[in-house]
Amino acid sequence: VIVTYSRNVFIPLTDFCRNNCYYCGFKKNRSILSQKEVENLLLKAWNATEALFTFGEKADIFDVVKKWLKERGFKTFLDYVIEMNRLSVRLGLLPHTNAGVLKKNEIKRLRKWNASLGLMLEQAVELECHRESPGKNPKERIKTIVNAGKLRVPFTTGILIGIGEAKYDREYSLDVIADIADNYGHIQEVIVQNFTPKKGTPMENWKPPDSLK
């Protein structure tokens, strides 16, 4: 068996996000990384191969983000993301972008500058913890993954366990991913991620899932 891997550098462009997932501790600082900050992170990652761009979904619905983008000559946050993808390529790192739910034309734009894209399915069923998170609608997430397949974009996805789903929900969610992979052949990685309670979130007192299960 041959196991391959690539070192990556984590680039959290912003923690502004339209979703309010009950387990998430990502939205802390309400900040945006500047181009200079991104460049510094990329330059420090001299031994990395991949730049992992992550950020909150649809960040540009917030007025403060719109203002920040306008001051720098960008119309949308996706425009800024693509510019940072281009910077990464110029500095010799392969971009991988986790952008949340995307339209087909947005995937096309990202495809040009990314080695791969990613979106965790999390669960293929509706859950209480996503009640205030329109971007976690499983139908919309599945549609994004399928559209990436139609566009032949290498893709990473996976499930998040311990967030209120039943055992058969996990099995069903993995089956959904397997079916998409069979149909389009673009899924390169499937992550099985465990829920970890985070202080200050509605689910801070939930027990994490048993690793043996």
Q: Which residues are covered by each model-predicted region?
A:
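Short secondary-structure boundary segments
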Residues: 1-6, 55-56, 60-67, 131, ...
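A structural micro-motif
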Residues: 3, 93, 153, 185-188
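Canonical Radical SAM [4Fe-4S] cluster-binding loop centered on the CxxxCxxC motif
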Residues: 3-37, 62
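Short loop/turn motifs enriched for small/polar and acidic residues
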Residues: 8-10, 14, 54-56, 100, ...
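Auxiliary Fe-S-binding modules of radical SAM enzymes
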Residues: 91, 171-213
